Curated annotation (Swiss-Prot):
Protein name per UniProt: Arginine-specific demethylase JMJ22
Residues reported to bind Fe cation: H324, D326, H407
Reported consequences of knocking out the gene: Plants missing both JMJ20 and JMJ22 exhibit reduced seed germination efficiency during PHYB activation after red light (R)-pulse treatment due to an impaired H4R3me2 removal-dependent derepression of GA3ox1 and GA3ox2 causing lower endogenous gibberellic acid (GA) biosynthesis.
Keywords in alphabetical order: Gibberellin signaling pathway, Iron, Metal-binding, Nucleus, Oxidoreductase
């Protein structure tokens, strides 16, 4: 990595392409405390790179370094010629239209094109488009591609070129490397303001968390799961190593995925996230059970026609999911079997900083990577009245994510988890309302019959649980009237139309 002053490592924001037991409860004083302990006033300063971080490929430096190098000329511009007026992102978009042969030729034209044409995400796209999941990761995506088509060709070292370019300055390309090799800063992991419970009854869970739509971390409810004892890498490789699972846009054998995850050094590592794992490998389905709190799963009335609802999740440190709201207005639980995960959650009425949903909610624009969000936007919430709910969920613990909550999850180490989305009486009306939206074709997910899911689900609920929907609608209307009366009382008090008499 080139020598850089810490102030120059301030990143540039980039746009993305669009039984009843005794209750033991540890809870913060309020969900959104007005002020927190001054835990983040002191910034550690700069960034700490991962121990295994390689040197910066090709010598790309942040643009600010140019101003500390009098007389230097940015070879990025001279090497691009008339294309220098284009942003780095646009240059890469154009190069993304090229095949491997043309990228290889272009890399020989100038120093600038050499760097752009060797940008790893370009080669990642080529590997996934052409080879799908049938590849052996070879240290880098470019090396992986070449090895697949020219197995006798040998790269030196880890598959990267030894050619270093001097005086190439680019915030965009430098940050791509930085996000791939940055350790999570301690202050990003320090805040833990979620409610944690152990041995809570189902009734208390519903009244304290599910009905008020409040996140909670559940401890001890995975005791007895065979998966907790069994699901090591060795076990999974032995039992399902040759089974293909969904990894990003491709299907990939688990043993090949582990080879990839061991060697991956990128800001957005591929994530194994498979909704059909139980059908593919019934033994995995038999080694975990739905925690008692989430067994009212009303989508079950649809049988095999229900939308995708459960996933096995495997990924290396740094992998995860950027900010999103779970599909179809469902709530979710996420059980960590091995590893640990950092969670950041915002309530439905608070859009996270750096996240820009479209008016209809069909699309969300957010930073390119999770690390980039922490670098650029985490501190923005420091003075917010409603601060995010944060925690680290460890092996054997379960996170409850209420419907409508924005959440981000990043693996702090290699992790294996099970997650399920569900609809209970507490959020059934929300789900039905969501499914009947005019743009359901764009919003509903996990099924091919998006436009008819509302009618199918409602009919099945009415047949299986007669009167349930009407009862819930009546309770909702009563609660709405009570809230309106409460607001009306205080409004009249504030406008002096209501007077106390003693």
């Amino acid at each position: 990595m080139p020598k850089c002053k810490n102030l120059l490592l301030t990143s540039k924001r980039r746009k993305s392409k669009s039984k009843r037991l005794k209750l033991h409860q540890h809870e913060p004083e309020s969900l959104f405390p007005e002020k927190e302990v001054e835990e983040e006033d002191e910034d550690e300063g700069g960034f700490k790179l991962k121990i295994a971080a390689p040197s910066q490929e090709h010598g790309v430096q942040p643009l600010g370094n140019l101003y500390f190098n009098p007389g230097a000329v940015n070879v990025r511009n001279t090497g691009l010629g008339n294309l220098q007026i284009l942003s780095d992102e646009l240059v890469l978009d154009i190069l993304g239209l090229l095949g491997a042969n043309h990228l290889g030729v272009l890399a020989t034209v100038t120093k600038s094109f050499y760097i752009f044409a060797n940008h790893e995400p370009l080669w990642r796209n080529l590997v996934l488009e052409e080879l799908k999941g049938d590849f052996l990761f070879n240290g880098s995506w470019r090396s992986t591609y070449v090895a697949a088509y020219h197995p006798k060709f040998k790269f030196a070292g880890d598959g990267e070129s030894n050619l270093k370019i001097i005086d190439f300055y680019s915030d965009y390309l430098f940050q791509s490397w930085l996000c791939a090799n940055l350790e999570m800063k301690p202050k990003w992991l320090r805040r833990d303001n979620i409610t944690r419970v152990r041995g809570i009854s189902v009734e208390d869970f519903i009244t304290k968390f599910e009905e008020p739509n409040k996140p909670v971390l559940l401890e001890g409810c995975l005791d007895g799961w065979p998966a907790i004892e069994k699901w090591s890498r060795d076990y999974l490789t032995k039992v399902v190593g040759d089974v293909e699972f969904a990894v990003g846009p491709v299907e990939m054998k688990l043993e090949k995925y582990f080879r990839y995850s061991d060697g991956a050094r990128e800001e957005r590592p591929l994530y194994l996230f498979d909704p059909k794992f139980a059908e593919k490998v019934p033994v995995l389905d038999s080694e975990y059970d739905v925690p008692v709190y989430f067994r009212e799963d009303l989508f079950g009335v649809l049988g095999n026609e229900r939308p995708d609802y459960r996933w096995i999740i495997i990924g290396p440190a740094g992998s995860g999911s950027s900010f999103h709201i779970d599909p179809n207005s469902t709530s979710a639980w996420n059980a960590v079997i091995t590893g640990s995960k950092k969670w950041v959650l915002f309530p439905p009425d608070v859009v996270p900083p750096g996240v820009h949903p479209s008016p209809d909610g069909a699309e969300v624009a957010c930073p390119v990577s999770i690390i980039e969000w922490f670098m650029n936007f985490y501190d923005d919430t420091k003075d917010w009245e409603k601060k995010p709910i944060e925690c680290i969920c460890k092996a054997g613990e379960v996170m409850f994510v209420p419907n409508g909550w924005w959440h981000l999850v990043i693996n702090l180490e290699e992790s294996i988890a099970i997650t399920q989305n569900y609809a209970s009486r507490s959020n059934l009306l929300n789900v039905l309302e969501f499914l009947k939206k005019p743009n359901a074709k764009e919003l509903v997910s996990g099924t091919t019959d998006r436009e008819n899911l509302h009618d199918k689900f409602k009919k099945a609920i009415e047949e299986a649980y007669p009167g349930t929907i009407q009862e819930l609608e009546k309770k909702a209307e009563e609660a709405k009237r009570a809230e309106e009366q409460r607001v009306s009382f205080w409004d009249s008090a504030k406008t002096d139309t209501f007077k106390f008499s003693f």
